[in-house]
Amino acid sequence: MLFRSPIREGIQTEDVHFAYTDGTSVLHGVSFAARVGQVTAFVGPAGAGKTTLAYLIPRFLRPRSGRVLIDGADIARVTRQSLRAQIAFLFQETVLCDGTVEDNIRFGRLDASETDLCRAAEVAGANEFIRKLPQGYQTSLGRAGSKLSVGQKQRLALARALVRDTPILILDEPTSALDPEAEKHFLTMLREVSRTRLVLIIAHRLSTAAAADQILFLKNGQILERGSPGELLSHPGGAYRRYVDLQTRGWTGSEPTDN
């Protein structure tokens, strides 16, 4: 079955369980809903299952049991190609090709206009540094973007994801290599972008999580709390509030790397 767009409602998971082939169990009965026009942040310590949960939506992984629904349609019953045409996914590790700045952004959507490219770069906070490059958008980036800083690479990868103009946008730590000013700019622009999209963010920075409409706080493969940043912070004994308090005191967590 082909997936039909546009997406009008959102994503829902129902009692999702997931385990890797080696038997490692990662998700345990996860249920949540995220709506179009809303930014939802997956937050929690390393090993909580945030990335695994995000990977289920474009079917990079399949749940052991439970369902993932988009607008009420079980994604297991639609073609993978038609599903992924609805989703732009920004991975944690930035990968660039050896071409120009324009080549790297256009890779997200080959028929994108120059206006589309510039708009995506502006939202990603990349337009300013691109304009300062020797040939602007036609500047060659060298092998795997070797001429750019880590933060600049991440902004180009963000622009590539944004130029796809898909109804679902999934961002894995999108601000991890951005300085505070660039992060603030990106989060401000993301609010505008999210008006007509469903945005999921895997957030490690508290400032990124604070910009979300909804936080899903995960630990040990379960959602312990959900709500707006203000709601969760208003509970002194809550799991998210404790996590924030520990983070602000410099604790980084001792759990294994996130699956």
What are these regions (language model features)?
Residues 1:
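Residue-level detector of conserved catalytic or cofactor/ligand-binding positions
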Residues 4-259:
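ABC-type nucleotide-binding domain
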